[in-house]
């Protein structure tokens, strides 16, 4: 379909013998869905506007350039287990969900995106050893659960430039991670849910000052299991706090809890 330049919606699936999808003239599209497990060449280089959600599933592509596409607040879902490099523009105007199936990648890179105007979610990159995200600001929610199984990759999960999360932060199961680091993060405007289950080191939010906003009702839940969640500069929590600690087992005891500079919790503490 080399002459197609616009489509109200486009769905490609159950095409078992197709290895190439070429849409070199497509500049705008509504809902866009591709599910094709033999496609190793995918060309949407002219696409400028996505006016609906886009889902790419089971493609064999290894790189994807999104730097020219305006997602107009819509959601891009990527379920491609060989996709190891994504390049975006400075501002990503939409939601980005990275949800590969049966992924065995050991390396993954996301480049170029500094400002995420929607949600960012990433799950089930079991074997990736370094997961370093470039964001400075994320306007929506962040959800990270790279390892929900028993794979021992010793992953390093870092957001070295991130300063503010406009929504909620959820750090779920990142089992056997060596490091989870948000060194510049100052504010989480939504709720915060963090678990340290089976981590190899503490999680430290070294510059985090506040969780929630005065206008909202948020919840901070810290599930501390064998390793700590350190917030040395945290002063204000606009909402309730629920701290859960692991019981003593196999010679280990529940951890110490210390948030020395907290001045205000507007909700319940439990």
Regions found by a protein language model. Give the residues of each.
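Concave beta-strand-loop units of leucine-rich repeat
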Residues: 3-18, 25-40, 46-62, 68-84, ...
């Amino acid at each position: 379909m080399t002459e197609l330049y616009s489509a109200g919606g486009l769905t490609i699936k159950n095409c078992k013998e197709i290895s190439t999808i070429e849409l070199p003239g497509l500049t705008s599209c509504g809902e866009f869905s591709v599910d094709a497990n033999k496609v190793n060449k995918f060309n949407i280089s002219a696409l400028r506007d996505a006016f609906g959600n886009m889902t790419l599933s089971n493609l064999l592509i290894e790189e994807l350039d999104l730097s020219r596409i305006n997602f107009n607040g819509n959601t891009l879902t990527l379920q491609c287990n060989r996709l190891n490099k994504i390049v975006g523009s400075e501002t990503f105007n939409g939601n980005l969900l990275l949800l590969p199936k049966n992924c065995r990648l050991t390396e993954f890179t996301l480049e170029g995106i500094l400002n995420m105007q929607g949600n960012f979610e990433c799950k089930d990159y079991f074997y990736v050893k370094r997961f370093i995200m470039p964001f400075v600001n994320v306007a929506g929610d962040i959800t990270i659960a790279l390892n929900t199984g028993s794979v021992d990759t010793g992953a390093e999960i870092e957001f070295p430039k991130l300063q503010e999360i406009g929504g909620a932060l959820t750090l779920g199961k990142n089992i056997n991670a060596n490091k989870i680091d948000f060194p510049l993060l100052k504010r989480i405007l939504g709720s915060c849910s963090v678990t340290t289950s089976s981590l190899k080191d503490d999680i430290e939010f070294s510059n985090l000052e506040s969780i929630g906003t005065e206008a909202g009702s948020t919840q901070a839940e810290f599930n501390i299991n064998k390793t700590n969640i350190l917030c040395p500069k945290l002063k204000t929590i606009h909402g309730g706090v629920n701290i859960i600690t692991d019981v003593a087992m196999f010679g280990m005891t529940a951890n110490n809890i210390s948030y020395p500079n907290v001045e205000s919790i507007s909700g319940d503490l439990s």
